[in-house]
């Protein structure tokens, strides 16, 4: 058997960073079940790699449900420390809207190439799937590797083609929460294929007590875009299911979209009353261009059962109220998650059994966890890579120093 101080399981962002952090003081092996590293990293940000979010740490933490758990790792491995790893190898960064950080080359391959360069003196075993870990005096992995400490960074369960298939959940005695889809496009009950490709800009999406202002992209099967992805995680939290038991989740949820957030309902009613008098000969389909994307108007009018060539002066009070209600609360009935496009896994190894200052299990000594295999998940926009890199670094550092 080969012997190492630390074995890191999983060659994604968290595992790579854990191996880098641990290697300064320890003999490390990185175990990757694929034939190469960083499969999921390569497709993040549409292949451009939205590596982190540049918000100040306090504001960054407020974006997470599990901010108290993440706090120590975020302060231990800051954005500046992360970006300096790449700047020291000649790669700088650009900051785009919503504080999203990308490499200046806009190529995820360049991020991965530098990370691999930091790993050049570390033993890496490819096509190595861990199916068994035994804890004796040390850890025995697949009956052929001995390690004093183990870091599990196997990712989530919702992107199996990249290697994230939930492998890490059953390797230890640490409890696992319900595993759900996160940051996932939504499938609607109504067929939207005729308006696929339309973007609703700067609308307010509402689900129960949660709301967010962002863009909504209409797809052939439903809704996507940053706002939808973020609110999908709230839907997921609200619905009782576990994809390890049943991957096909049926939904009966309703999203409400405020298509005119610059007006409240009374202001819109007043505007309609005045405009319908002053512009009485204008067709409603033309009038709505002031409020809606042009290609969305026929679909919208069909939903309120008003003909597009109806003059404003001929619209009665009931129809006017119906228009106002639809503009302020346009309803989309949701039937399912578009599960094959789930960006992250919601849930994982329960953080109640993890020491947030070290990432060590409180159940099994010398066992650490990092990245998406853990319970926390954040919104879209670089937040989840931030979790991966910071928890990975903290796990690697803690394991090597203990």
How should each PLM-predicted stretch be described?
Residues 35-37, 42-43, 51-52, 57-58, ...:
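An anion/pyrophosphate-binding glycine-rich loop and adjacent beta-alpha core
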Residues 126, 298-377:
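A glycine-rich dinucleotide-binding beta-alpha-beta segment and adjacent secondary-structure elements
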Residues 7, 23-46:
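Glycine-rich FAD pyrophosphate-binding loop
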Residues 46-98:
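Glycine-rich active-site loop/strand segments that organize a redox cofactor
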Residues 158-171, 375-402:
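A conserved FAD-binding loop/helix module that cradles the flavin
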Residues 2-14:
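Beta1/beta-strand and adjacent pyrophosphate-binding region of the FAD-binding site
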Residues 7-9, 31, 130, 145-160, ...:
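Short hydrophobic core segments
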Residues 126-138:
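A conserved short coil-to-beta-strand element within the FAD-binding core of flavoproteins
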């Amino acid at each position: 058997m080969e012997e190492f101080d630390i074995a890191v399981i999983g060659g994604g962002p968290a595992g790579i960073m854990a191996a880098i952090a641990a290697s300064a003081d320890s003999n490390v092996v990185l175990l990757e079940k694929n034939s190469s590293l960083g499969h999921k990293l390569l497709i993040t940000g549409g292949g451009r790699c939205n590596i982190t979010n540049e918000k100040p740490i306090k504001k960054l933490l407020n974006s997470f449900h599990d901010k108290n758990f993440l706090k120590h790792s975020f302060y231990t491995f800051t954005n500046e420390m992360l970006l300096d790893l790449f700047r020291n190898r000649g790669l700088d960064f650009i900051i785009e809207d919503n504080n999203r950080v990308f490499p200046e080359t806009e190529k995820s391959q360049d991020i991965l190439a530098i990370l691999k360069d930091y790993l050049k003196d570390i033993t890496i075993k490819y096509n190595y799937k861990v199916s068994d870990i035994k804890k004796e005096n040390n850890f025995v992995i697949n009956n052929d590797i001995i390690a004093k400490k183990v870091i599990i960074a196997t990712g989530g369960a919702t992107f199996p083609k990249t290697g994230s298939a939930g492998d890490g959940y059953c390797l230890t005695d640490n409890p696992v929460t319900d595993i759900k889809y996160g940051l996932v496009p939504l499938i609607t009950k109504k067929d939207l294929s005729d308006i696929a490709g339309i973007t609703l800009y700067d609308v307010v999406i509402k689900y129960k007590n949660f709301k967010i202002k962002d863009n909504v992209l209409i797809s052939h099967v439903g809704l996507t875009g940053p706002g939808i992805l973020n609110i999908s995680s709230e839907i997921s939290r609200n619905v009782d299911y576990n994809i390890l038991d049943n991957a096909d989740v049926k939904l009966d949820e309703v999203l409400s979209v405020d298509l005119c957030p610059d007006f409240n309902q009374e202001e819109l009613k007043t505007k309609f009353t005045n405009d319908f008098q002053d512009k009485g000969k204008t067709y409603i389909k033309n009038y709505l261009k002031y409020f809606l994307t042009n290609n969305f108007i026929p679909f919208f009018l069909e939903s309120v059962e008003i003909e597009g060539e109806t003059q404003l002066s001929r619209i009665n009070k009931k129809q006017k109220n119906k228009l106002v209600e639809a503009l302020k609360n346009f309803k989309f009935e949701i039937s399912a998650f578009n599960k094959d496009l789930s960006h992250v896994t919601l849930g994982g190894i329960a953080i109640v059994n993890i020491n947030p200052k070290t990432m060590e299990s409180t159940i099994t000594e010398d066992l650490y966890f990092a990245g998406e295999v853990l319970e926390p998940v954040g919104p879209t926009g670089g937040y989840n890579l931030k979790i991966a890199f910071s928890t990975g670094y903290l796990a690697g550092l803690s394991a090597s120093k203990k």
